[in-house]
Amino acid sequence: MAKKSMIAKNKRPAKFSTQAYTRCEKCGRPHSVYRKFQLCRVCFRDLAYKGQVPGVTKASW
């Protein structure tokens, strides 16, 4: 989990567009965030297995 101060800082608009970065909406993790879902890989995997991410199914071949 990210610090509450870092999550609050990320919610404020950045002064310049280059300062903006993605964070996971669920846990606040700054690395490995899927932009389409706004979730990190850990949270994405957890929610996908539970079936809570619409349009995502387990791959089988």
UniProtKB/Swiss-Prot annotation:
Gene Ontology terms describing biological process? translation
Q: Could you say which residues bind Zn(2+) here? A: 24, 27, 40, 43
The terms describing its cellular component in GO are: small ribosomal subunit
Q: Which domain of life is it from?
A: Bacteria
GO molecular function terms listed in the Swiss-Prot or TrEMBL record: rRNA binding; structural constituent of ribosome; zinc ion binding
- Give the cofactor note: Binds 1 zinc ion per subunit.
As cofactor, the record names: Zn(2+)
* Record field: transmembrane: none
List the NCBIfam families: PRK08061.1
Q: What is the annotated quaternary arrangement, including any partners?
A: Part of the 30S ribosomal subunit. Contacts proteins S3 and S10.
HAMAP family recorded for this chain?
A: Ribosomal_uS14_2_B
Which family, according to the similarity comment? Belongs to the universal ribosomal protein uS14 family. Zinc-binding uS14 subfamily.
Q: What is this protein called?
A: Small ribosomal subunit protein uS14B
What is the originating organism of this protein?
A: Streptococcus agalactiae serotype V (strain ATCC BAA-611 / 2603 V/R)
